[in-house]
Amino acid sequence: VVAVDVPSGVGVDDGAITGPYIPADVTVTFGALKPCLMLPPAAYACGRVTLVDFSFDIDGHMPFVEAVSGDNAAETVRLPRLADTKYLRGVTGLITGSERYPGAAVLSCKAAAKTNIGMIRYMGPQVCRDIVLDAVPEAVLGKGRVQAWVVGSGVPTGETEDDDFQRETIAKLLTHYALSSDDDPDDDDLAYDMPPLVVDAGALDLLPDEVPPQVVITPHAGELASLLTARGEDVDASDVQNEPLHWALRAHELTGATVLLKGAVTIVVGEPADTDRESDAQGGFADDEQHVRVVVSGRAPTCLGTAGAGDVLAGMLGALL
């Protein structure tokens, strides 16, 4: 089956499939990639996608959806410079792992250590510290200078006293990112000045009502549904899987956080860095007043659908931020 431009029956702008559709073996599209060719679940119905370039003048326009390539992803990575010290390369602080999931501490710390970072500072529970040091001997334990945080990976919901203490520690950290409800600009300035923060797994239910955009949340469909339900939305995991873009946008709207919705196609929703910038990414285009940026990545191998992959992702994000 060959689809012309897009498969029949899919939501062109949002990738949703709400009725009968015809899955394609090959989709031939024209001018630029349409959002549904990049967004699930419609993206799974496209087969092999071929773009016929009509040389449209798209420079200077903000794409509604951008597909990550190796080249434009590499442009965001800061390479070490000759005079860099460990502090100039960055210090990532991690509060991860638990008695039940000690491996999450190791995976998140090792991932951060291998992602171009100057120092790992680990502040998880005692049960995890020895195995973290065994796996990452350069890790530093305890409080100190931190330039980006990772919290929540492998942290269960209060199963032991150590878990309770760890959740209290994370909750105290998160209070510094809470935007005020009384429009006090001084309080908000403090939150915006905090370092980047990755909130994963067991810390998602501790997220304040509203946070600045340097807070990155990394839920899968079930975790995003729980976060939205706690904020009054009527949604479950299957709803998120059926309309992932809609619910990722809704989570960003409600919380202010940058939302990284994990899946076979990962969707990232956040504030655009510069709405006037040029982009070499190919994608569907929106008007110039768009206030969100949507980036998708679907190039990962299926073997990443395994326990621990989210812990590795969180550690890498903390190092990159």
Language-model regions, residue ranges each:
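Glycine/threonine-rich beta-strand-loop-alpha-helix active-site module
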Residues: 1-37
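Small-residue (G/A/S/T)-rich helix-start motifs and N-terminal tracts that mark the onset
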Residues: 24-26, 35-216, 221, 225-321
